[in-house]
Amino acid sequence: MPNLKDLKNRIASVKSTRKITKAMQMVAAAKLRRAQEAAEMARPYAEKMEAVMSGLASAVGNSEGAPRLLAGNGKDQVHLLVVMTAERGLCGGFNSTIVRKARVHAQKLLGEGKTIKILTVGKKGREQLRRDYADHLIGHVDLSDVKRLGYADAASIATDVLNRFEEDEFDVATIFFNRFESVISQIPTATQIIPAVFEDVEEADDTSKDSGTLYEYEPSEEAVLEDLLPRGIATQIFTALLENGASEQGARMSAMDNATRNAGDMIDRLTIEYNRSRQAVITSELIEIISGAEAL
């Protein structure tokens, strides 16, 4: 049976840990509100941007003048994986789930005989992927000093990716991030950004026809799309960063809440054990006193 001093020290230690996890939970809750608002405010702009580009892509189709970012370079051999994770841990399975999704995709591509290159955003993803894919890592984006994500951060990443594409370093680019659903639900998501893919191209085209509105583009649809696509890619990356940021805070808030609850349960168990041990010591001392009195 543990002695009373050890139990008392353990209770004090767990109480101290509970204070830390509770404080982290409250900080994450405050950050989550801001991050969630930012993600929700960015969604309408991203959706409208995609709708505009989708309509243009439908009009341009596979014509000879189609932008390279839409048509691709005609190859599908080298794939760039942009994996977005957090700079810090203590957020449950937030980092591991997105890394797992990237790993599955990487293994699928390697199994098909293709080449992969990995660009990591966030320290935790780099640490995990370096164990198995060190030779495939080509770059890392450190956001540890960024207090509040801005469009400039996404534009910087987009510029790097676009430059690599222009230099024919890869053929296809996919971003991996967690899409925010709720505090307890973050969805690992993979989105191809180069060549640009629009799931609802036909639907968008039908909608524009049904509306009866005709648009004329100057100098041409191809030229407008050529100018919009880099901005669209930057917007996709920005949206992914915001979704990832909200997901991280939600995951951390949930993880710290669970840790606080577990610490409370442990304190209760240790307190019961302490009281039982103390009761046993007192009972033993009383027996010794009574035995001594009877001996006299």
From Swiss-Prot:
It is found in: Cell inner membrane. It is a peripheral membrane protein. Keywords: ATP synthesis, Cell inner membrane, Cell membrane, CF(1), Hydrogen ion transport, Ion transport, Membrane, Transport. SUPFAM superfamilies: ATP synthase (F1-ATPase), gamma subunit. It comes from the Bacteria. The keyword Ribosomal protein does not apply. Its main location: membrane. The keyword Ligase does not apply. GO terms for cellular component: plasma membrane; proton-transporting ATP synthase complex. Belongs to the ATPase gamma chain family. Produces ATP from ADP in the presence of a proton gradient across the membrane. The gamma chain is believed to be important in regulating ATPase activity and the flow of protons through the CF(0) complex. HAMAP family: ATP_synth_gamma_bact (MF_00815). This is ATP synthase gamma chain.
